[in-house]
Amino acid sequence: KMQDMPDVEIKKSLFTFTPKYLQLSETTVNIGKNDITADSRFENNIGYALKGTTLKGSLNIRSNYFNLNDFMPATGEEMSSSGDVTTTDSVSSTGIVEVPRNIDFQMDANLKQVLFDKMSFNNMNGKLTVKDGKVDMKNLSMSTMGGNVVMNGYYSTADAKKPELKAGFKLTNIGFAQAYKELDMVQKMAPIFENLKGNFSGSINVLTDLDAAMSPILDTMQGDGSLSTRDLSLSGVKAIDQIADAIKQPNLKEMKVKDMTLDFIIKD
């Protein structure tokens, strides 16, 4: 067991090693509560181990439960018991997940439940290419925030100090309130979502740098998109409630809108 890491248990594995390739068949590993099963084949494993040359591989990955938060490094700041922010000895460490430059992997993923930060993803499926410090995602589909998302794009740490995310999202029946609850970016850019009832669909394209906590840096963000909703209601906004009381129009406390489409552009 490694310090600050969950217990690792290899339940089963069929291991084949030759000078040309390394193959793992039906390898099942439990890391704490997390499980992962992989069929994989790696080439140039000796050159990778001895000379640091590129390791090539293909992987088919399956999992019932995988909590990415268990593997995120601590950031350089921690909250003290008094509530003050204190800097620890690991000030140089960040929560950035750095993609190795000397691997070339083709991956098929089928993950039943994935947790990351405050978000939960179910039935995540798609293809990923990991190469040159970059993860390309193709038709990565998942259920989240009450609806469904399909993602295409990339995450790059070619510059490890400035990770970059470029992604296109196709959204179907996402809950406004759930998006506000789970996405820090929505809380900062669209706090009104907290008071909206209903679902939305549409598409979003975004390019942004990421900070040490893997959150978008809003000053660098660019993008566009279109969102539509067929049944939307707004309530619980204090300022609107006060106006409704002042003019004696209680029906204004809950406003309803149908068949609305919003096109938008994001600029730094």
Predicted features along the sequence, with ranges:
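Intrinsically disordered, low-complexity segments enriched in small/polar residues
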Residues: 73-98
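Small-residue helix/turn framework positions
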Residues: 1-42, 46, 52-79, 100-115, ...
